[in-house]
């Protein structure tokens, strides 16, 4: 079980030789290997990795020395140096890291992944549960609203800023990006401005791109039983209050589903619960435990009791 990149890690482990036979059922919360940032094709990661090695004074050749040196560098430093490896004229909010698993040669000692999860020749068959927050992409939008300069630039020149925020250069050829951005703007915004007045459209865009499309593709390409649920309940607290300037209205946003499983006193030390909060938490915990025990997701039903198919 994992959330966000942890959910993507769960999904990628389906294809990891070292994890074969270790699972009975799997749970991914807002994260699959098909999401951007969750898997890094080697063609995209070789040059940035060597640049990172130079920044931490590791040799880039031979590869054995490169790997041995990099393994001894504190992971915090590797993440902190990312902005120097992927520089942009526009500094985007730090909502995650671009470093992700990539394909390793089968000859490597204990390789994690030897095939691309997106094009794997076999289909795993573990019972798999996916849960998405209705406004998962709100996490990105909240950070944008918390950076006045970035918010202004996005409103003034979305064709310049959106490709950077979405890191389209990691997924598409540079020549195709202008047309892709035009289609994005036409589909989500039409003739409307891009900014606070179109918060819901921004949230839909970032939700679709970073979360929903990946889950849809992963589910359609899955070989076993897979269930996908959209979490819509808003607890009395939300991670929106901790992101950006705290003004984002869309919810439940990224990670909010965790608030129905865990109290999280670190982030919400004064949290209180309504009767409905408790009711939903009990439902979610019981349904999750049931799925973990027997792989049956049927206890995840809407609170109104409607049948889910």
Which residue stretches match the model-derived regions?
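Serine-hydrolase-like catalytic core of hydrolytic proteins
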Residues: 1-67, 72, 89, 103-106, ...
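Short, solvent-exposed turn/loop segments enriched in Gly/Ser/Thr/Pro and often Arg
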Residues: 4-5, 229-237, 303-309
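Sec/Tat-exported extracytoplasmic proteins
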Residues: 17, 56, 74, 192, ...
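Substrate-gating cap/lid region and adjacent catalytic-acid/histidine neighborhood
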Residues: 34, 69, 76-278, 287, ...
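Glycine-rich, phosphate-binding/catalytic loops in enzymes
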Residues: 44-45, 145-149, 300
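Surface-exposed helix-capping loop/turn segments at secondary-structure junctions
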Residues: 59-63, 222-227, 290-308
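C-terminal catalytic lobe of FAD-dependent flavoproteins
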Residues: 284
């Amino acid at each position: 079980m994992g959330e966000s990149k942890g959910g993507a890690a769960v999904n990628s482990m389906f294809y990891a030789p070292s994890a074969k036979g270790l699972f009975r059922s799997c749970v991914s919360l807002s994260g699959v290997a098909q999401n951007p940032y969750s898997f890094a094709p080697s063609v995209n990661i070789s040059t940035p990795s060597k640049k990172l090695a130079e920044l931490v004074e590791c040799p880039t050749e031979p590869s054995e020395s490169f790997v041995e040196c990099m393994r001894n560098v504190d992971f915090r430093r590797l993440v902190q140096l990312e902005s120097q490896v992927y520089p942009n004229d526009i500094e985007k909010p730090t909502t995650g890291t671009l470093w992700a698993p990539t394909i390793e040669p089968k000859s490597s000692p204990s390789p994690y992944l030897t095939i691309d999860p997106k094009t794997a020749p076999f289909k795993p068959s573990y019972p798999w549960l996916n849960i998405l927050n209705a406004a998962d992409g709100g996490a990105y939008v909240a950070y944008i609203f918390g950076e006045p300069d970035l918010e202004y630039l996005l409103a003034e020149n979305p064709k310049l800023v959106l490709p950077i925020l979405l890191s389209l250069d990691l997924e598409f050829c540079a020549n195709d990006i202008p047309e892709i951005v035009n289609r994005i703007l036409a589909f989500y915004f039409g003739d409307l401005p891009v900014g606070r007045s179109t918060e819901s459209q921004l949230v839909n865009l970032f939700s679709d791109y970073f979360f929903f499309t990946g889950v849809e593709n992963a589910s359609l390409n899955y070989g076993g039983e897979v269930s996908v649920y959209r979490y819509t309940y808003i607890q009395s607290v939300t991670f929106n209050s901790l992101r950006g300037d705290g003004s984002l209205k869309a919810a439940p946003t990224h990670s909010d589903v965790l608030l129905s499983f865990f109290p999280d006193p670190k982030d919400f030390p004064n949290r209180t619960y309504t009767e409905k909060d408790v009711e939903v938490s009990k439902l979610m915990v019981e349904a999750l435990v049931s799925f973990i025990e027997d792989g049956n997701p049927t206890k995840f039903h809407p609170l109104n009791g409607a049948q889910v198919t």
